[in-house]
Amino acid sequence: AQSFLRL
């Protein structure tokens, strides 16, 4: 998973 998905 990309870090931008970790909101």
Swiss-Prot record:
Q: Which residues form a coiled coil?
A: none
Q: Which UniProt keywords apply?
A: Amidation, Neuropeptide, Secreted
Question: Which GO BP terms, alphabetically?
Answer: neuropeptide signaling pathway
Location within or outside the cell: Secreted
> Which positions does the record annotate as the modified residue Leucine amide?
7
Which cellular components does GO assign to this protein?
extracellular region
Q: What does this chain do?
A: FMRFamides and FMRFamide-like peptides are neuropeptides.
By sequence similarity, the record places it as follows: Belongs to the FARP (FMRF amide related peptide) family.
What is this protein's name?
Answer: Extended FMRFamide-1
Q: Which species expresses this protein natively?
A: Striatophasma naukluftense
